[in-house]
């Protein structure tokens, strides 16, 4: 549902939608993602705050024929991606956390995607609610892609809009996502 509402906002033919079996670790590592300016991952995040190299994203664990496959994209693999994305959105639980290393800062998924080439990453600070996250992301992309707001302003506008709705008024539903990196420039999807 989240992916469908976002892809509907992009220009026809401007995106790659990989869901279910097609959302694979192999696709993420294939280099194909380097063609796109915005990457949105709506999946499960794995956080290992003691051994951050074991953190990652979970893609399909079975292929179209029902055979098991490695669906775990680990942090060291993320560091080695070569991305041209203006923005990476990690729409999963605790994707903005990591391990604090003295003299280095926070080691986690955000740093991995920035090291891979993304100047800005939207990530979560806690275990987020699925329905609220889908609504927040829909509003975020509407503000960014339709209204032309920079990513930081679009996220703020989406969060303010949700905070004004009775159902989503609690900050638990909308405040968990933050933008890391360069916040002022607009993002152009491909």
Q: Can you say where each PLM-predicted feature lies in the sequence?
A:
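Catalytic cores of enzymes
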Residues: 1-190
């Amino acid at each position: 549902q989240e992916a469908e509402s976002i892809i509907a906002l992009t220009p026809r033919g401007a995106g790659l939608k990989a869901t279910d079996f097609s959302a694979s670790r192999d696709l993420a590592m294939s280099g194909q993602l380097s063609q796109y300016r915005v990457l949105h991952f709506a999946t499960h995040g794995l956080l290992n705050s003691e051994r951050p190299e074991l953190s990652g994203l979970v893609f399909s664990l079975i292929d179209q024929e029902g055979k098991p496959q490695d669906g775990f994209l680990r942090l060291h693999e993320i560091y080695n991606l070569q991305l041209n994305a203006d923005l990476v959105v990690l729409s999963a639980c605790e994707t903005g956390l990591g391990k604090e290393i003295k003299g280095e800062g926070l080691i986690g998924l955000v740093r991995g995607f920035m090291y891979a080439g993304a100047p800005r990453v939207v990530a979560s600070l806690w275990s987020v609610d699925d329905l609220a996250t889908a609504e927040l992301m829909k509003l975020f992309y509407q503000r960014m892609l339709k209204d032309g707001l920079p990513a930081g302003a679009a996220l703020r506008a989406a969060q303010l809009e949700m905070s004004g709705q009775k159902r989503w008024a609690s900050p638990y539903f909308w405040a968990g996502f933050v933008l890391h990196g360069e916040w002022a420039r607009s993002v152009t999807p491909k």
